[in-house]
Amino acid sequence: MTSTTRDVLHKLNFSIADASPEYIDRRKLQMAKFFTFAALSIFSTRFIYKQTIARQYVPLLFQQNHQPPTSYNFTADAMVAVGAGTLACGSISGMLMFGTAWILDVSNLKEFGYRMKALMGGDVKEKELSEMKMDDETRALQDGLNDLLEGKI
């Protein structure tokens, strides 16, 4: 980010003007992922729309309108529908996922877990639970499980 850009951001009172270059690059990457999936979503839905219009059967005068023509290939139509539906579902899901990650400022699942725990109050409950006294039976059970996991038994 150039100094003139930072000056403009300071003038407009944006807090990102004081951010580190690593943070700015991270946010740019999150934004790029979101917009990539948004563009893919637009492309896939437009593709589905065009395929639907192209396959629409419009009968000529005095032709039956309740039966498709005999040259119609149901297998190919089903394959295109499954592929296009999968593409649309994947791209929209990706857009939703990366948009949420961009809004919450998370880059991986571990950060997402920490953020959700903090938003739902789980970190406070976990701290309270860790500060509680542990009785002897629970401590013995915990030590036994730790020994089992570490391979001491």
From Swiss-Prot:
Keywords: Membrane, Transmembrane, Transmembrane helix. GO terms for cellular component: membrane; mitochondrion. It is a multi-pass membrane protein. It is found in: Membrane. Disulfide bonds: none annotated. It comes from the Eukaryota. The chain crosses the membrane at residues 31-49, 82-104. Its main location: membrane. Belongs to the AIM11 family. This is Altered inheritance of mitochondria protein 11. It comes from Lodderomyces elongisporus (strain ATCC 11503 / CBS 2605 / JCM 1781 / NBRC 1676 / NRRL YB-4239). The gene is AIM11.
